[in-house]
Amino acid sequence: MFIGFDYGTANCSVAVMRDGKPQLLKMENDSTLLPSMLCAPTREAVSEWLYRHHDVPADDDETQALLRRAIRYNREEDIDVTAKSVQFGLSSLAQYIDDPEEVWFVKSPKSFLGASGLKPQQVALFEDLVCAMMLHIRQQAQAQLPEAITQAVIGRPINFQGLGGDEANAQAQGILERAAKRAGFKDVVFQYEPVAAGLDYEATLQEEKRVLVVDIGGGTTDCSLLLMGPQWRSRLDREASLLGHSGCRIGGNDLDIALAFKNLMPLLGMGGETEKGIALPILPWWNAVAINDVPAQSDFYSSANGRLLNDLVRDAREPEKVALLQKVWRQRLSYRLVRSAEECKIALSSVAETRASLPFISDELATLISQQGLESALSQPLARILEQVQLALDNAQEKPDVIYLTGGSARSPLIKKALAEQLPGIPIAGGDDFGSVTAGLARWAEVVFR
């Protein structure tokens, strides 16, 4: 049996075809979405959990070496890896919030798969993380289906996050493919996420149109100009319908990070001075919220940065504020900070102003964020997104008849306004912002696996 599988940066979802229509399956708490989060007692627990409780093979030398190190480490630390040691989605977030110092937590593993300079053991670790999530998702889907799931069309961005170009894309897709096969999928095919979103929209068209798909996901923005319509449905070879593509490593997570940096970090002393009037360095505050940047997070949570923060507290004109950043370092609160910014971004899609409260850092710590503040904070990443729209059109040398906007950030009035200003007079359509890619992947799975 086949599925469409959106292994997303922000959320994961699965769809099957029933009576000619895609149907998303339940993943967690009666929702069709599983937030892309995972927690465990230690990083090493994930590898042992796969082997000990799910008989997932360690196929090559690097994954075997990782497994041996993991088992040895967990034994030395007296950590008993049980069937429930690894949690996913909101369950993992709840455990992390309850005890951030004792829980190893990761959000959006997909963000790191195309990172440059990953060592073989780091690639093996990310493969295990992805495999664990895919295994869990496959099990959730399997419980709702009568036949064994063996085939999947998995979505991928035009360009994964990372600076390595084609090499980064090959690295990331390789991790996804190996992880999927270790998780039990025998046949795996990849499809570009904006193309998949377009396929779902195509099902509503009565005539051929040039459709500009703008898919703003958690980690990437992907744009495709596609010829779509009844005559293209069910055609395995659609090369002639693909007019232009572009993609950049800017997505919803980057919007959340930018909002946290500009609007929340000043509460923690960013922009302050020493007693001598010298500006404090900005980098520690940026690294604290750059949750999709492995080197930045490693640097922030290093012992050397802990010593630097001690020095900054000692020298700052407002040491009590910088001490709050020190608390973020000590209690590993980066994800909670960015999560607070995300909640404000979502709220500002329907209200003019919202209050950001950070009681997990300090009881009274709060600030108001307005639509104007949001627009100012997001100006740079938004400009990058609009560049990709223009690049896709330049590659195609054609104008769209309609814009199909999808992805988790598609609901933002700010983004719709910017697109309308860039392409005046062209209608903007939307669908299921969180499910259109998954539905399109299921439609494509029906074409390739039927």
PLM region descriptions:
Residues 10, 219-221:
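Conserved Rossmann-like nucleotide-cofactor binding loop
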Residues 261-270, 421, 425-428, 443-450:
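Short, well-ordered loop/turn and helix-capping segments at boundaries between secondary-structure elements
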Residues 1-34, 70-213, 229-248, 365-366, ...:
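N-terminal phosphate-binding loop and flanking beta/alpha elements of the actin-like ATPase fold
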Residues 20, 29-76:
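Extended N-terminal export/anchoring regions of large proteins
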Residues 35-40, 64-65, 228-360:
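Phosphate-binding glycine-rich/basic clefts of nucleotide- and phosphate-handling proteins
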Residues 118-119, 146-147, 269-273, 343-354, ...:
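Intrinsically disordered or highly flexible coil/loop and linker segments, enriched in small
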